[in-house]
Amino acid sequence: MSGMFSGSISETSGMSLQCTKSAGHWKIVVWDEEGFQGRRHEFTAECPSVLELGFETVRSLKVLSGAWVGFEHAGFQGQQYVLERGEYPSWDAWSGNTSYPAERLTSFRPVACANHRDSRLTIFEQENFLGRKGELSDDYPSLQAMGWDGNEVGSFHVHSGAWVCSQFPGYRGFQYVLECDHHSGDYKHFREWGSHAQTFQVQSIRRIQQ
């Protein structure tokens, strides 16, 4: 898709779109031991802390429906892990692509607006939606290979759907989940990407599967 980062975005296709949450239910089952062993608990809504259930951490899980984001610490803090439909028999199944694996997952919540078929994101060179910009509606394992200069993104506006940005190409490194129903889709600075964000470095981006 050569030239996809070179055009400007008109006001009618810009930041005025409303986010539509995907219809459906969310269900996740977690265990306190690897291999789906030990104590088990099922959720259909957010869990701010598995510690309150007597779990030290989640060590295996199955996502039965919907998309979820897991967090290293209670209260939706720390590293983020995208959890799409499927089985995760051990912690490295959800943290295998990160360069900074953490053997803890203690809170999680649904990604309500994930919509793989209708996802659109504008990336900006500088914070506060300044500088060069480009519009994305597909998965990009390397932004630089698609024409984006440098290895940083200053700010984002999520028009629709939910996205996961990664620090390095190939969806590696820290993950940052961006949703159209959080911050009104506006992420003006890396401080709004998550409590673990320390840099503007983003080199791959993909849509979250519902």
UniProtKB/Swiss-Prot annotation:
Gene3D superfamilies: Crystallins
Keywords: Eye lens protein, Repeat
Region (N-terminal arm): 1-25
Any GO molecular function: structural constituent of eye lens
Location of region: Connecting peptide: 113-118
PANTHER family: BETA-CRYSTALLIN A4 (PTHR11818:SF19), BETA/GAMMA CRYSTALLIN (PTHR11818)
Official protein name in the record: Beta-crystallin A4
Species: Bos taurus (Bovine)
Name of the gene: CRYBA4
